[in-house]
């Protein structure tokens, strides 16, 4: 009898552990579908009215952090959604703002000069900031340049915020779609001809991420409608830090 009880307890514990490891991104997906339009602009006032739902999702992220048993796609989807959800939450915490960079001017924390350095995130008991997620985790652990088209820093010149969350089972296709969306948006990247282009500053800031195995032109040609020639003349567009908000 005791052996049966022990077996049942062990089985329930196993199922409990599996349940804890599963994170549903559906609540965030519902928020994005409701408050982000097709161009990626955000209704921050609307999300603010349902901030409890966003906070509930963030609580799930805090308590169900990636485990070694997770697949790479499960981990990466988690961290991309976490970055975007926490960025929205940061905007709401200081709303109204004209730019996310205005938050850096508002805060009075020693040695913290930008909104990306504010330790307002707590995952697995560890305090972290948006830079920790992007540079310390995502760029460090995943050799995936397309993340630059998925992480959205709440600015007009950032890649558009997709009106859906990222899910492990569709992650590869979603990242490719985000890359194509970004490179075919003439306000972000202007391909004048096969010999000349004005690109987003993202390709200047993170050029090394895109050129580990190929040239920048060859990387762009995988997702752009215009095929750049080798040694094309490339310039970089000014970055618009205005808030990506619906008017």
Model-predicted segments: where are they?
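Interaction/scaffold regions that mediate signaling and macromolecular assembly across diverse proteins
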Residues: 21-247
């Amino acid at each position: 009898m005791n052996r049966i009880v022990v077996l049942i307890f062990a089985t329930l514990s196993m199922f409990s552990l599996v349940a804890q490891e599963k994170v549903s991104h559906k609540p965030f997906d519902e928020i994005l579908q409701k408050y982000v339009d097709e161009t990626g602009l955000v209704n921050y006032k609307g999300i603010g009215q349902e901030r409890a739902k966003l906070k509930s999702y963030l609580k799930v992220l805090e308590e169900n952090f990636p485990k070694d048993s997770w697949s790479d796609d499960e981990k990466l989807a988690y961290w991309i959604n976490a970055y975007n959800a926490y960025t929205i939450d940061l905007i709401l915490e200081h709303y109204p703002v004209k730019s996310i960079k205005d938050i850096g001017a508002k805060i009075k924390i020693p040695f913290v000069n930008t909104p990306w350095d504010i330790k307002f995130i707590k995952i697995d008991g560890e305090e972290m900031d948006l830079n920790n997620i992007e540079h310390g985790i995502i760029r460090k652990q995943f050799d995936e340049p397309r993340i630059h088209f998925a992480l959205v820093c709440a600015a007009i010149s950032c890649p558009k915020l997709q009106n859906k969350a990222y899910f492990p089972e569709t992650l590869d296709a979603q990242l490719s779609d985000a890359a194509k969306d970004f490179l075919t948006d003439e306000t972000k990247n202007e391909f004048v001809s096969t010999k000349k282009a004005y690109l987003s500053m993202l390709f200047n800031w993170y050029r090394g991420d895109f050129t580990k195995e190929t040239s920048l032109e060859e990387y762009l040609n995988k997702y752009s409608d215009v095929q750049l020639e080798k040694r094309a003349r490339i310039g970089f567009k000014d970055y618009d830090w205005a808030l990506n908000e619906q008017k």
